[in-house]
Amino acid sequence: MTNYHFVGIKGTGMSALAQVLHEMNHQVQGSDIDKHIFTEDALRAKGIPFFPFSAENIKEDQVIIQGNAFGDDHPEIARAKELDLTIYHYYDFLGHLADEYRSVAITGSHGKTSTTGLLSHVLSGITPTAFLIGDGTGAGVAEAKAFVFEACEYKRHFLYYKPDYAIMTNIDFDHSDYFTGIDDVVSAFQEMAMQVKQAIVACGDDEHLQNLQANVPILYYGFGENNDFRAENATSTPDGTSFDVYLRDDFYGTFLIPGFGRHHVLNALSVIAICQYEGLNKEEVAARLSTFGGVKRRFSETNFGSQILVDDYAHHPKEISATIESARKKYPDREVVAIFQPHTYTRLKSFMDDFATSLREADATYLCEIFGSAREQEGQVRVEDLQDKVPGSDILTRDNVSILRKHENAVLLFMGAGDIQTYQHQYENAK
């Protein structure tokens, strides 16, 4: 048993990794800011202790897991260096852990977390599976031989991983504070592809993934006719989305997923493809797909009077469009209201026009103050700049959330990667 201390344990990946190690019977604790973050609820439920940041948290018998947002000048890291403790960055440790299993890395600019959650749910019902999901959920299973984990492309961290399999959902330009453009992103994914040891499952509808080179087989999935796994006849039903799957030219089966929207069908296709490649029972896979309850902060619904409140992590223009599409398909007779909090000044500046285009797809739009990051607390852009590009949009503050009451019978989409949840909570508790 090893004694682990996590510096920044409330991070989504860090929280999940802490749970994995805890369930493997290691001693786990961590530290973070005092502010409530949704990931801490799972830590508390599993009895994993966490404390405010302090150099006094660091003890001589610990192995330190350093969160990506914290540098070597952090007081806890500095203390760990003084004590000559073993220190791993999160992504480095995760790479070593994955090497101990038959591993599946899920990566892509969008859809990583939902796809990781879906594959984890399906496999866990068929064979013992450990998993790490980017919504802060993790499970360590003693008898597991498979490990499903989310692999983030930011700063090329996923190059620390050499998985047996990889699912690649799409390639898009994001993280403009690091990547220089789409070619730089494509280059990173190409490097990742060369490290996969068994097979890659990639979305063939994505123009960049179509040109992927690898030393292992690539199975393509999507709606396009040239894909190895192809979805047809996608239909919204009261229970979700039904669709037919063709394996090249042959009918493979009909599947039902609880989600709505093309992106959910694509996520399911990738899972179906890798399960078929591994020889898993098709009926068992279909049964598990139909019972997937989703992941945290991905179209998480709350009934609130006549309204439906949705909490969603969408923080990129394409993710906003996908969330709005899901709302329209699930609730075709309701008004769709977007409440969006931009996450980082750099991202807003880089995608200003795209954000405006996506938000105009809603029936009404409210904008919240920009949420910075640990690396970026201010910038050369204002939320009012986005408001100018979205006709009829309003600025929403925590003091005026009651204005949302006028949207009776509407679906209110609270979207963002910052603290947009505080606006929803304020609205739910407003007198």
UniProtKB/Swiss-Prot annotation:
Gene it is expressed from: murC
By its UniProt entry, which PANTHER family does this protein fall under? UDP-N-ACETYLMURAMATE--L-ALANINE LIGASE, UDP-N-ACETYLMURAMATE--L-ALANINE LIGASE-RELATED
Predominant cellular place of this UniProt entry's protein? cytoplasm
Disulphide linkage map: none
- Where does this protein act, in terms of pathway? Cell wall biogenesis; peptidoglycan biosynthesis
Q: Report the function annotation for this chain.
A: Cell wall formation.
Q: Which keywords does this chain's UniProt record carry? A: ATP-binding, Cell cycle, Cell division, Cell shape, Cell wall biogenesis/degradation, Cytoplasm, Ligase, Nucleotide-binding, Peptidoglycan synthesis
Subcellular location per the Swiss-Prot or TrEMBL entry: Cytoplasm
Family per similarity comment: Belongs to the MurCDEF family.
Organism, by scientific name, is: Exiguobacterium sibiricum (strain DSM 17290 / CCUG 55495 / CIP 109462 / JCM 13490 / 255-15)
- Which protein, by its recorded name, is this? UDP-N-acetylmuramate--L-alanine ligase
